[in-house]
């Protein structure tokens, strides 16, 4: 499972002219389920995301998490994170999970986030979204959780 995490002062997602998700200070999380991902990868990614220390402490060091600062999470599905352009100029998205699997894993991830964090907003899976943000820093961190092999 892939995530592109951006520290923001504020962010919002608009679908068909209506705001469907909005946060103030916090993390904008672009999320992509890859082929082979399960709920386990989503759980591991969520734990990492909530503990990711990319907010400044009193000394100005990145030493605080979104939980520490009471920030929001805005989670937006983005299958294009699985793009592979190594074979030419047109990217392939074959590494992304099938749409039905992607939707299921996205919904499980958002539900899990809402169970563990007080302020969680989301985009709309599969919609044409406009994402507005004020980047803070900028700080952008890619995260990837690879499926663990099952014992034989």
Swiss-Prot record:
It catalyses: glycyl-tRNA(Ala) + H2O = tRNA(Ala) + glycine + H(+); a D-aminoacyl-tRNA + H2O = a tRNA + a D-alpha-amino acid + H(+). GO terms for biological process: D-amino acid catabolic process. GO terms for molecular function: D-tyrosyl-tRNA(Tyr) deacylase activity; Gly-tRNA(Ala) deacylase activity; Ser(Gly)-tRNA(Ala) hydrolase activity; tRNA binding. It is an enzyme of class 3 (hydrolase). A Gly-cisPro motif from one monomer fits into the active site of the other monomer to allow specific chiral rejection of L-amino acids. Homodimer. This is D-aminoacyl-tRNA deacylase. It comes from Aromatoleum aromaticum (strain DSM 19018 / LMG 30748 / EbN1) (Azoarcus sp. (strain EbN1)).
């Amino acid at each position: 499972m892939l995530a592109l995490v951006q520290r923001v002062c504020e962010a919002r997602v608009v679908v068909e002219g209506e705001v469907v998700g909005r946060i103030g200070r916090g993390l904008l999380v672009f999320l992509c389920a890859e082929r082979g991902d399960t709920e386990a990868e989503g759980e591991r990614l969520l734990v990492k995301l909530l503990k990711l220390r990319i907010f400044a402490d009193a000394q100005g060091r990145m030493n605080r998490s979104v939980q520490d600062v009471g920030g929001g999470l805005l989670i937006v599905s983005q299958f294009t994170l699985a793009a592979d352009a190594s074979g030419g100029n047109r990217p392939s998205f074959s590494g992304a999970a099938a749409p039905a699997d992607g939707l299921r894993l996205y919904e499980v991830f958002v539900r899990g986030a809402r169970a563990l964090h007080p302020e969680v907003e989301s985009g709309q899976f599969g919609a044409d979204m406009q994402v507005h943000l004020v980047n803070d820093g900028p700080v952008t961190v890619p995260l990837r959780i690879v499926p663990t092999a099952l014992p034989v």
